């Protein structure tokens, strides 16, 4: 199977956008193969046709991904030869989202700046999880198709994070689960995301939905809207939340995107 894909860099969350049509039944296997080939890549999305949007993005685990949404918007802008300094607004069809996702992209020197209006969290709740030292209670932020466990600094040790995430994700009915290590004082996250269909656990250098989850958890705890610049290994993602006194009513992320060249490869399973 000959595939074309583009390597895209949204805040170092290296994303492979496969532009050759791939059957859903083969996407997880194809994504796993590509991730073994592209050592810097952290996730794979598949371009599909949509009746209601310029394009549809199907992520490898069926999850919603803010950075990948931003990446698709930037890819469309390059395809349309958007001049530097100009902007385009899209409503994109993204896996894990029940409605079209608004995405605004501006062409800048060296790439693009994208803002995505994320689906609102379905829930933000405290849940208890087992560790070798007893149970810990942590906020779990659930979005369509993905949930994130937000762990403040010191709650879990770095050496046990991947094992704990795999263990905890078995109790969560999602194909994609993140464990977001949050240093609130430095306003920094270190995100680990486990995707069950591909059995991959990746320390992401930038995570849009993980940044949003941390911001939503803080919004609930602080009881106020937040405007945060959240550092992560690959850079900074800005997150803005709106709050009505009991729930998050608005959620956007903003980050940078750079696009690499298109590649062609013969996939052999």
Segments (PLM) and residue ranges:
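Membrane helix-loop-helix hairpins that form the core translocation module of multi-pass transporters
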Residues: 112-120
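Active-site glycine-rich loop that binds ribose-phosphate moieties when present
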Residues: 120-139, 158-167
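A glycine-rich beta-to-alpha transition motif near the start of alpha/beta enzyme domains, typified by
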Residues: 1-112, 142, 147-269
């Amino acid at each position: 199977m000959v595939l074309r894909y583009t390597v895209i860099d949204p805040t170092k969350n290296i994303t492979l956008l496969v532009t050759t049509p791939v059957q859903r039944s083969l996407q997880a296997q194809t994504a796993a193969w590509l991730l073994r080939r592209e050592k810097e890549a952290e996730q794979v999305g598949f371009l599909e046709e949509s009746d209601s949007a310029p394009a549809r993005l199907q992520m490898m685990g069926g999850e919603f991904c803010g950075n990948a949404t931003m990446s698709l918007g930037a890819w469309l802008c390059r395809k349309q030869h958007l001049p530097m300094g100009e902007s385009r607004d899209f409503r994109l069809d993204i896996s894990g989202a029940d409605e079209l996702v608004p995405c605004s992209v501006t062409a800048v020197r060296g790439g693009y700046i994208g803002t995505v209006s994320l689906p609102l969290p379905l829930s933000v709740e405290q849940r208890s999880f087992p560790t070798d030292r007893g149970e810990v209670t942590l906020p779990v932020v659930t979005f369509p198709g993905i949930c994130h466990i937000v762990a403040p600094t010191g709650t879990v040790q770095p050496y046990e994070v991947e094992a704990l995430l795999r263990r905890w994700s078995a109790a969560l009915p999602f194909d994609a689960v993140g464990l977001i290590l949050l240093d609130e004082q430095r306003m920094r996250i270190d995100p680990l995301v486990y995707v069950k269909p591909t059995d991959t656990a990746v320390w992401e250098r930038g995570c849009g939905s993980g940044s949003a989850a941390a911001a939503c958890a803080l919004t609930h705890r602080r009881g106020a809207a937040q405007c945060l610049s959240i550092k992560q290994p690959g850079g900074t993602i800005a997150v803005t939340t709106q709050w009505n006194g009991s729930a998050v009513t608005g959620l956007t992320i903003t980050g940078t995107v750079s696009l690499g060249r298109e590649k062609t490869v013969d996939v052999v399973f």
